[in-house]
């Protein structure tokens, strides 16, 4: 009797253990399926964001919106999805939705300097320079941001638009300290100097850059303007020839023709 009792006592436990194991396998299977579905949805969202951005670049905003709406359904917690949608709404002129989407992107990726920089660009383009500059500097000081010199240059451009040139000068100089071969920062600094009548430092900056690094169309056209303002026709012609040879058919080459410096 006791033997039967022991056997009866073990059987339920044995069955229970098997049931628990089966349940664990089922749960693991569900978790695996959920993870796979989430990964597939994320990949689909990434693809639709790429398509949406491509359509935006082509000016097809209707198709862009369709792709980005799909991306949002597939991965509503993606900062990249919200950032792309923010750019779309900005293009559509819907500032409220654009701002909300940029904020959503930052909510899902608060420390991502790309998202911070993107929002800063939007803020500056819409006259919110104080907020924009603050965001640019936040991105520039982020240790994982690979191009802080670009953020400092953007901050300077934003400050110039707000007629805060001396603060802009500091940010352009910071950018060049971080990356001396960053042509955009050199152009912006030399252009600021030119606008303030500081012809000698503007010319020195242009010549120093071109003599060490690759020239750009913007720097060469500015070189023409600076040299002409200095009355140095030979230097102006030298810049002009290089612009025509190295960058034919560009907007800068056409602007050169309009200056009558070709």
Stretch-by-stretch model annotation:
Residues 36, 209-262:
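Terminal, low-structured helical/coil segments at or just beyond the last alpha-helical repeat
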Residues 26-29:
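C-terminal motif of bacterial Sec signal peptides marking the signal peptidase cleavage site
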Residues 40, 74, 108-109, 142-144, ...:
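Structural marker of alpha-solenoid helical repeat scaffolds
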Residues 31-34:
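Bacterial signal peptide processing site
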Residues 50, 84, 118, 153-154, ...:
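Canonical tetratricopeptide repeat
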């Amino acid at each position: 009797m006791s033997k039967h009792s022991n056997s009866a006592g073990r059987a339920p436990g044995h069955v229970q253990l098997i049931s628990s194991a089966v349940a664990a396998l089922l749960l693991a299977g569900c978790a695996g399926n959920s993870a796979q579905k989430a990964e597939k949805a994320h990949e689909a969202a990434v693809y639709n964001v790429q398509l949406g951005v491509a359509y935006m670049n082509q000016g097809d905003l209707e198709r862009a919106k369709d792709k980005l709406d799909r991306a949002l359904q597939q991965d509503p917690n993606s900062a990249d999805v919200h950032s792309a949608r923010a750019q779309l709404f900005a293009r559509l002129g819907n500032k409220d939705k654009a701002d909300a989407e940029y904020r959503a992107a930052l909510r899902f990726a608060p420390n991502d300097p790309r998202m911070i920089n993107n929002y800063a660009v939007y803020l500056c383009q819409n006259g919110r320079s104080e907020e924009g500059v603050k965001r640019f500097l936040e991105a520039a000081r982020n240790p994982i941001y690979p191009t802080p010199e670009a953020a400092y240059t953007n901050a300077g451009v934003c400050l110039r638009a707000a007629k805060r040139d001396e603060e802009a000068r500091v940010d352009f100089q910071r950018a060049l300290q971080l990356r001396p071969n960053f042509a955009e920062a050199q152009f912006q600094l030399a252009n600021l100097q030119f606008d303030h009548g500081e012809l000698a430092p503007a010319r020195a900056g242009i010549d120093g850059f071109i003599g060490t690094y690759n020239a750009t169309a913007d720097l060469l056209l500015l070189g023409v303007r600076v040299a002409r303002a200095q009355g140095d026709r030979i230097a102006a012609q030298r810049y002009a020839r290089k612009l025509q040879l190295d960058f034919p058919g560009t907007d800068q080459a056409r602007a050169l023709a309009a200056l009558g410096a070709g």
